[in-house]
């Protein structure tokens, strides 16, 4: 048994005056930037609310059900009762200013989570004590690790009768490996939390009137009923700390006990290096355990000053290290944008070095332009508080500044650019049209603003169908964008499944005549052409002339070609553009008075229609290349689904991510309208895919009649 020397640390926190935190200047060693991420519904916003209230940063404990939380304040969030956007708030614990970035857990809003985690120095991943580890838990953890962020699991909702901390802890260890290290655990009797054990202090605390009071440690009998031995967990903490430092390793195996400072410093170091992921627990409703979490934030989580130097790129493309040093030239990164039509653009900025000062000119290293820094504010949810400057390591919002998400701004004495964040690509596509005629320009202007704000949406014209296509990450994301258009920009739109850009072509060579003759007094109209039509591999019309003896004067050749170019925009089957068509003008006749360019254009159009009918026209459908990643357990289901969608599976490969398989296939685009939603449902959000148009193939005969009926055009 390892004996640990216990140094008592009081649990009471200095209470900050409401808003006082925003008036102080914080050194980079005294700032902590924390993203709160995890599965939707796992308690992220409630935890944010509890931390703010318990620290004294707010004077009331908001509730999601009441729509009065600090971080979920937009109409969309209040209506949905979940986070849609990453919000910024701050508190003070000990000597530290803590910036909290409450991120959405819904997969449709993953872009917001990317921004929040990118700006953070550490990620608290909430795990419901009732639901346990879910797909969103893995997504948050994977995002954090991809960006090199230390992580801590916070088990929430332990006041629920169906919560089971032991099951969750077992899941965490199984899913995330030996780095998982509990530091605070609940003592549960009759499905109720009676106290919490701080494994670092080796003390138990119960809560009376919201205050922690030291109580007896649980007996061995109680520990066994809970499913975990307290003494075993305490020893596991020491074992984890021993792995962080050679001197600690030697001390551990010599049988010496660690001091409490050695334990906290060791966990702190282990978090920085990624070999320790602490697990703690709270109840955000009665606030039990929240004061312990505040202390863990104080003692365990790293400030920006401890982070390795950022690697940037100079104007010459050379790598440069940028350390978090306030005396160095300023450099900062725009990680989020809010497009507010009333207050203007709000740019969320993380300062990496130096100081960001209002009204000072800086270089936008991404665009090369010079910009003036706008007014700086910090946020407490929607509340804005002016700040005089922002030191390195801090997060602020610049008002009305001409910069965009992923831009780097810096001092002209050291121009440096940081790598942009990588966002998931929007794959859920819907056609959008204005409800009111004449609002099209308003939609375009509003979407331009929204695309500045959200890099996971796209809005552009599909020239093949002449529809405006809005691409998002899913149905909820689409609803949010449509809601913003109406609520924020006053433009109502309708959405529909995008049209499929079918094409038409021919299968055999024919020779036809096109003759246009009209006499109505005075000059008439006369144009006569013989044209050979044959299949070819070009997407565009291929036009040639092989006229001998001047049967058609050369000056009318362009008119014939123009008539054909206009005609191939609509096929004879269902009005789709024609591809793979070669036209050779071989003969014809003309009238010295009545022939004109217009007459020969008409003659070419007549020849085209007759030639298409005789040349066995067929419909072509677009085929896309699909690369879809699914959990190994879903491989069979996905193969069956692709077969239902007329897909051709080309191969399967083990993915880089353990437990995932890549399936490569070709699938008709007409079968992919709901694939985003199907994949999310099948894989509980774990699946991802890319899909790009590859080529056209003949539409199966059994589907032709239906497509023609829906798209038939008048002769």
Q: Which role does the model predict for each range below?
A:
Residues 3-10, 15-715:
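Structural and coupling elements of P-loop NTPases
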């Amino acid at each position: 048994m390892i004996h640990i020397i216990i140094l008592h640390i009081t649990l009471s926190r200095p209470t900050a005056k409401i808003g006082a935190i925003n008036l102080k200047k914080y050194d980079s060693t005294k700032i902590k930037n924390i993203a709160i991420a995890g599965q939707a519904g796992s308690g992220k916003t409630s935890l944010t609310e509890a931390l703010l209230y318990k620290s004294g940063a707010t004077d009331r404990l908001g509730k999601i059900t009441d729509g009065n939380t600090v971080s979920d304040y937009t109409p969309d969030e209040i209506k949905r009762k979940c986070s849609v956007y990453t919000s910024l708030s701050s508190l003070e614990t000990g000597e530290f200013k803590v910036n909290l970035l409450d991120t959405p857990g819904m997969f449709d809003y993953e872009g917001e989570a990317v921004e929040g985690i990118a700006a953070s120095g550490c990620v608290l991943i909430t795990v419901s004590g009732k639901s346990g580890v879910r797909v969103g838990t893995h997504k948050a953890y994977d995002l954090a690790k991809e960006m090199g962020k230390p992580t801590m699991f916070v088990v929430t909702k332990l006041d629920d009768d169906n919560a089971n901390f032991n099951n969750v802890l077992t899941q965490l260890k199984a899913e995330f490996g030996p780095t998982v290290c509990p530091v605070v655990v609940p003592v549960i009797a009759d499905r109720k939390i009676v106290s919490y054990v701080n494994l670092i202090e080796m003390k138990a605390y119960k809560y009376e009137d919201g205050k922690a009071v030291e109580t007896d440690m649980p007996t061995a009998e109680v520990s066994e009923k809970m499913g975990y031995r307290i003494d075993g967990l305490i020893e596991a903490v020491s074992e984890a700390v021993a792995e962080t430092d050679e001197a600690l390793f030697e001390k551990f195996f010599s049988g010496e006990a660690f001091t409490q400072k050695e334990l906290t410093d060791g966990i702190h170091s282990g978090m920085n290096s990624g070999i320790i992921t602490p697990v703690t627990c709270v109840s955000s409703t009665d606030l039990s355990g929240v004061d312990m979490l505040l202390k863990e934030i104080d003692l365990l989580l790293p400030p920006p000053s401890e982070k390795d130097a950022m690697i940037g790129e100079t104007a010459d493309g050379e790598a440069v290290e940028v350390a978090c040093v306030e005396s160095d030239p300023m450099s900062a990164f725009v990680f989020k944008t809010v497009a507010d039509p009333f207050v203007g653009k709000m740019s969320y900025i993380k300062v990496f070095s130096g100081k960001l000062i209002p009204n000072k000119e800086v270089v936008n290293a991404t665009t090369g332009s010079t910009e003036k820094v706008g007014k700086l504010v910090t946020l407490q949810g929607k509340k804005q508080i002016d700040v005089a400057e922002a030191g390195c390591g801090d997060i602020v919002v610049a008002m009305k500044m001409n910069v965009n998400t992923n831009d780097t701004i810096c001092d002209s004495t050291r121009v440096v650019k940081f790598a942009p964040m990588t966002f998931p690509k929007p794959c859920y596509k819907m056609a959008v049209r204005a409800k009111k005629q004449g609002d099209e320009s308003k939609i375009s202007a509003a979407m331009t603003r929204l695309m500045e704000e959200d890099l996971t949406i796209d809005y552009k014209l599909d020239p093949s169908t002449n529809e405006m296509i809005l691409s998002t990450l899913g149905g909820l994301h689409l609803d949010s964008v449509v809601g913003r258009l109406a609520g924020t920009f006053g433009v109502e739109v309708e959405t529909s499944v995008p049209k499929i850009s079918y094409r038409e072509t021919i299968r055999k060579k024919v020779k036809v005549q096109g003759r246009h003759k009209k006499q109505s007094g005075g000059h008439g109209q006369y144009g006569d052409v013989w044209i050979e039509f044959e299949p070819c591999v070009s997407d565009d019309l291929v036009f040639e002339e092989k006229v001998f003896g001047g049967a058609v004067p050369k000056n009318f050749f362009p008119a014939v070609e123009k008539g054909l170019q206009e005609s191939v925009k609509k096929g004879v089957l269902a009005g789709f553009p024609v591809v793979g068509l070669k036209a050779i003008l071989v003969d014809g006749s003309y009238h010295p008075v009545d022939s004109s360019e217009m007459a020969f254009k008409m003659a070419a159009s007549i020849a085209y229609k007759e030639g298409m009918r005789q040349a066995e026209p067929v419909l072509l459908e677009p085929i896309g290349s699909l690369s879809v990643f699914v959990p190994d357990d879903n491989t069979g289901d996905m193969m069956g689904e692709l077969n239902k969608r007329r897909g051709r599976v080309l191969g399967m490969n083990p993915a880089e991510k353990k437990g995932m398989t890549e399936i490569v296939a070709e699938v008709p685009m007409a079968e992919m309208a709901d694939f985003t939603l199907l994949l999310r449902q099948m894989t509980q959000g774990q699946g991802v895919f890319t899909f790009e148009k590859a080529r056209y193939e003949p539409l199966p005969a059994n589907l032709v009649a239906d497509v023609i009926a829906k798209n038939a055009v008048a002769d």
